């Protein structure tokens, strides 16, 4: 990770050499003031983000570990489908037998016609 070269104080105390046709001292000072404000804002942001990371890591260590195994309260969908289809098959067999009992005489009577 790259380290920070300048602090806000370093920028504030930076002295520039003067030349005959140099930059406007007022403009340079205003620009450096803005840079200092940015550095202070970034430093505060980095500090708050580091604190948030530390808080989240601490919260993560306090939480119990969640296992990847399926919980017993949720049945396997394949097992549910298999038992459901067997149940449906049993119901259809029973319904067929009951229909033969109830309507069997009517079916036999209609075949005589």
Swiss-Prot record:
Subcellular location(s) of the protein: Cytoplasm
Alphabetical UniProt keywords: Cell cycle, Cell division, Cell shape, Coiled coil, Cytoplasm
InterPro entries cross-referenced by the UniProt entry: Cell_cycle_GpsB (IPR011229), DivIVA_domain (IPR019933), DivIVA_fam (IPR007793)
GO biological-process terms attached to the record: cell division; regulation of cell shape
Region (Disordered) residue spans: 61-82
GO CC field: cytoplasm
Superkingdom per UniProt: Bacteria
Classification via Gene3D superfamilies: 6.10.250.660
Pfam families hit by this protein: DivIVA
Coiled-coil region(s): 36-63
Function: Divisome component that associates with the complex late in its assembly, after the Z-ring is formed, and is dependent on DivIC and PBP2B for its recruitment to the divisome. Together with EzrA, is a key component of the system that regulates PBP1 localization during cell cycle progression. Its main role could be the removal of PBP1 from the cell pole after pole maturation is completed. Also contributes to the recruitment of PBP1 to the division complex. Not essential for septum formation.
Family, per entry: Belongs to the GpsB family.
Annotated PANTHER family: CELL CYCLE PROTEIN GPSB, CELL DIVISION PROTEIN DIVIVA
Assembly with partners or alone: Forms polymers through the coiled coil domains. Interacts with PBP1, MreC and EzrA.
Protein name: Cell cycle protein GpsB
Originating species: Streptococcus pneumoniae (strain Taiwan19F-14)
């Amino acid at each position: 990770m790259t380290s920070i070269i300048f602090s806000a104080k370093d920028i504030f105390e930076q002295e520039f050499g003067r030349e005959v046709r140099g930059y406007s001292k007022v403009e340079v000072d205003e620009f450096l003031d803005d840079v200092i404000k940015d550095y202070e804002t970034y430093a505060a942001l980095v500090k708050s983000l580091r604190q948030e990371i530390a808080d989240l890591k601490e919260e993560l260590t306090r939480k119990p570990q969640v296992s990847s195994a399926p919980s017993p309260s949720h049945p396997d969908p394949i097992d549910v489908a298999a038992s459901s289809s067997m149940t449906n098959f049993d119901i259809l067999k029973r319904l067929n037998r009951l229909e033969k009992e109830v309507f069997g005489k009517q079916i036999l009577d209609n075949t005589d016609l």
